[in-house]
Amino acid sequence: MENIYLVEPSFLYEDIQVRLPYSTGLIWSHCKTNKIIEKNYKLSDILFVRDRIDKFVDNIYNPSVIGFSCFVWNWAFNNEVAKVIKEKYPDCVIVYGGQHQPSADRLKHEKDFFKKHSYVNMLVHGEGELTFEQILLENLKEKDWSKVTGITYQTNNYKFVTTLSTPRITDIDSMPSPYLDGTFNNLVEKYKDKNFRFTCTIEGVRGCPYRCTFCEIGSLYFQKLQRQSFNKLKKEIEWMSENKVVYIDNADSNFGLFEDRDLKVAKLLVYLKKKKGFPISFRNDWAKDRGERCIPIAKVLNEEDLNKGLTLAFQSLYEPTLKAIMRKNVTGKYMKEFLKKCKEENLPIYVELILGLPEETLESFKRGIFTLMNNNQHNYIGIYPLSILPNTPFGDPVYIKKYGVKYRKTKSLSYHITNTEMGSQEDEKIVCETNTMTHEEILKAHNIRWFLMICHFFGTTQFIARFFKNYLDISYESFYDKLYEYFIKKEDTVLGDEIKKFKVAIKEVFNDSRYWGWYLEDGRTWEFDEGSIFKIFKQKDQFYREIRRFIVEEIYADDLSIIDSIMEYQENALIIPDKKYPYKLNLDYNIHDVVKNNKNLMNGDYVYDIDGMPKSKNYNGDMIKWCRELYWWGRKEGRYKSIIRSYND
């Protein structure tokens, strides 16, 4: 029998958490239903845990065909493995599929691809199930790859031929599932001694109706939606719960679009977590422009702490930018009403923005963030650097030229791992300049993003800023401009030192001379924001003494007793790693009402009960656990904020 290997490597997070290889699992689940393939091929392994290249390759013996699932996070690793395999087994057919290998259109601009990657025999374009089946069947015959649809194959002298497209699957619900046909049972059994915590993927819908230019599934090819039935999803999720899967990643780009089915999915997840304890968490991308439909679903998920928050994926609030990326957002009035509704329902909201988009200016970028603050969005905002994905318009020279997009290669945006040395260091192409933002302005925007994240959206000065916004009508922009300018000149302070270090670090990132993020004492990389919070809380008392000094010198000094109350409130509004919860807090002013409800400031005896969310408190000084659970896992729902209840209401 011919040996098949499938390769879909992922990082091992915290040495125990790894993603089951959904893409290659789907490929094999379909192919093995073909009796000719079943008779003539043996799936020797699906390799999905990164390791040193030599150890990884040692798992492969006498392969006939190897299929690589390629993404931005494993591209360099796959290339190195494929090169070694080709040298060792020159007759092996190496097939690249996934999202990162060049599309047929992109190959028009990358005519030297097979010269640079001579070890690759062919590329699969679009969905892979039907195409890979054809490849395996033709491999048993004359190896006339021109008979296979949906591929580009290498010919003589690194030239290539692209065949006709494979039609999309019209009924993905009828396709076999690796969760249900035993494919993943074998993998779980193989690694049971490792005690891995598995992440699994479900695909409620394949495709997306939107055409966002930064997204790989924004092409016409994927525009028509194909959805799976609740009954099939139910069986898959039950398998995950039975196998103690901790984290489910929903590949549906618009969860909530099919609200009846998706509500059933949410209720099932809650039921299984209550009954069996798994899954612990569920991540999804919510339906765009359909926020009101998502609220009932998010409320259900929130019952059992499955929800990471309801997303508003704005990407930008600047109209010329939205036009350039073919994106339409909700109006300002709707946004305000939606945020208000979610607050009334006690639903955490987080917003997504992208830094480096076409037509965005430094001022429009800043204005967008402060607009969100002014609309009472004080929960997490994820602001992500724009990574150039090759099979998007950002890989098109015409589009790039039109908007003056320039990029630099940086280290991969991978965090919470220790095995970055295992195989090639992945890299990413991050936008460093556009026709509306110079490189220096991009760097400044990164500094602003980081600064506002640690100070406001991670909460360290948020409640002070909100107090003075309501009490003295000091705008958020004015407050944070003063805060930044004050501490940038004081490098001997906690915040000033962090500002200085980040400015150096982000320049080094774009010069490709360092990784993204900070190494902490657990030996792993953490995002810059997470790592800075960790370092600030290591010096919390000094940090807040210096913040108090800033307030007195730059903001307000008329009544120091008011400053004392707001400082005490601010410190207790965040979960502190060495505090015992719950406890009571006594203040001389109704700071809570001023901050939360914009009430007039009143003097008196005010008593508050301070607590944390269940399982998000009482860390007994374990700062790594505190930072992991609150600022890594729990940031989107604002777990780092304490729950404050007034006894004076």
Task: Identify the meaning behind each predicted range.
Residues L26-N40:
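Short helix-loop-beta junction
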Residues H109-L130, K299-G309, L372-I381:
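Structural recognition of alpha->loop->beta junctions
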Residues D173-E344, L355:
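Radical SAM [4Fe-4S] cluster-binding motif and immediate context
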